[in-house]
Amino acid sequence: MAKTATKVRKKIKKNVAEGIAHVHASFNNTIITITDRQGNALSWATSGGAGFKGSRKSTPFAAQVAAEAAGKVAQECGVKNLEVRIKGPGPGRESAVRALNALGMKISSITDITPIPHNGCRPPKKRRI
C-alpha cells in the first residue's frame, strides 16, 4: 500500500516590532523567552540548549549565549523594541539583558517580577557542605 505524502506547511513569518523578553534565571539554568505583546512566543533559548551542561549552565556566559540565540531569532521576526521582565535570583540576570542590548535591540524597560512570599511556604533547608 502506497503511503500518502504528508503536506509540508511553510512557517508563517511573523512581523512584530515590539516584544517582551522574559528572563527566568534560576540557580541552575537560565531560560529566555521572547514574546509579542499578547504573550505568544516568538523565540526561546536556554543555557542547557545552548550547549552547556552541569554547573556551567548556571554561569553568566551561558545566559549570554542563550540570550543571543533567542535574540537573533526574534530579530528575524522583526522585533526591534524590547521590554525585559526578569524573574529569579540566578547569576545570568544581568548578562542576558546586556546580550540583548548588544544585539542592537532597544530596551524600553527592565522589570523585576521575582515572586516574593509574604511568609508563605517554608524555604528549603540551608546546605551543609
Swiss-Prot record:
Single Gene Ontology BP annotation: translation
Keywords recorded for this protein, A-Z: Ribonucleoprotein, Ribosomal protein, RNA-binding, rRNA-binding
GO cellular component terms listed in the entry, alphabetical order: ribonucleoprotein complex; ribosome
One Pfam family here: Ribosomal_S11
Keyword Secreted in record: no
Gene Ontology molecular function terms on file: rRNA binding; structural constituent of ribosome
Domain of life where this protein originates: Bacteria
PANTHER family: 40S RIBOSOMAL PROTEIN S14/30S RIBOSOMAL PROTEIN S11
Free-text function comment from the UniProt entry: Located on the platform of the 30S subunit, it bridges several disparate RNA helices of the 16S rRNA. Forms part of the Shine-Dalgarno cleft in the 70S ribosome.
Subunit structure, as described in the record: Part of the 30S ribosomal subunit. Interacts with proteins S7 and S18. Binds to IF-3.
HAMAP family per the UniProt record, alphabetical: Ribosomal_uS11
Family (UniProt): Belongs to the universal ribosomal protein uS11 family.
Name under which the protein is recorded: Small ribosomal subunit protein uS11
Organism: Azoarcus sp. (strain BH72)
